[in-house]
């Protein structure tokens, strides 16, 4: 039986690795991102399985472009959102903060809503998104990043409840990885418990196939987050949570 997936943010990093795993598993995959050259490389590698669409999540028409891609493919069983940005910003540069909100907040909402609307009209599907463990607590070194990741966590939870209220056959998987060695992390800092992108992608796909509601990747971060959640605000605000220089 033909299975169709669309991966938003498939040009690099986790999105590309997940797209490759889906392709190896026999899926028809719509790959979407801003970089046409990287997407074309995937199409050349898998000409019978890949459909390309150049989409920028910050474009006001990006939702309509996603719907058009789904229709061009003949359906969308899985929408996988791997598009996002993040920077440490201890000086609270407003340009960085607003750019992060535009991509991780507005762009995320635009694409998830489009996928939700499409699946609601076409009998259901599965929405999976890479968020982050950073959404667990406010991180002083990356204010807008941690705030937008918390927004993503709650937004997916709210849509999952809405889908059940409306009796829609839509599943959700909120994927919360820790630090992964991708271009999203700059080379100027040392990141603790850094994870390999290929290994992380395999763990993510395992969670997607199992249709887990929330997947913290990997076990070390599950332990860390369990501890973070127990730290009261009066103590948390004094903790110097940051990467090493």
Give the ranges of each region predicted by the language model.
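Conserved glycine-rich cofactor-binding loop
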Residues: 11-12
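Rossmann-fold cofactor-recognition segment
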Residues: 46-61
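Conserved NAD(P)H cofactor-binding loop of Rossmann-fold oxidoreductase domains
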Residues: 80-88
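Short alpha-helical oligomerization interface
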Residues: 89-102
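Active-site helix of classical SDR
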Residues: 112, 148
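Residue(s) in the substrate-gating loop at a strand-loop-helix junction
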Residues: 132
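C-terminal helical subdomain
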Residues: 174, 189-225
